[in-house]
Amino acid sequence: MNSYETVNDVLVKLFNEIMDVEERALITSEYKDISVNDMHVIEAIGIREPKNMSTVARAVSVTVGTLTIAINHLVKKGYVERTRSEEDRRVVLVSLSEKGEKAFLHHKIFHEKMVMTVLDGLNPKETEDLTRALLKLQNFFDSYGNKEKN
């Protein structure tokens, strides 16, 4: 197998395995009422100040309309709270409830463990090389996504 085939196989397997492992790790009995996509919306909202819908939609790469559907479900399930901006009542702000903050931390801990496991045993040069390669991959996806939108 040449380098191209190896990289292609690794990328496909990694993508599928990360999605599978993330789903099994995140959707525990406590969080069985939400999906991995819901967890990503929760992550995008974050635990700081409330965010407007456009900001969250951009962070998860969906339209505001698509996000509205997800937010409606998360509000009903008690993970997200929706309010109006005091400055501009037309602006809808979303923030995490206590239940949502717990889910956020659960997701954050999973990612911390995943990253630490990947970096464990790598020397500084290997860590730098991996970081550089992953940034190039991210740049490809960012530019590919931007071409698709135009």
Predicted ranges, named:
Residues V7-V10, N37, K99, E126:
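N-terminal positioning helix adjacent to the helix-turn-helix/winged-helix DNA-binding module
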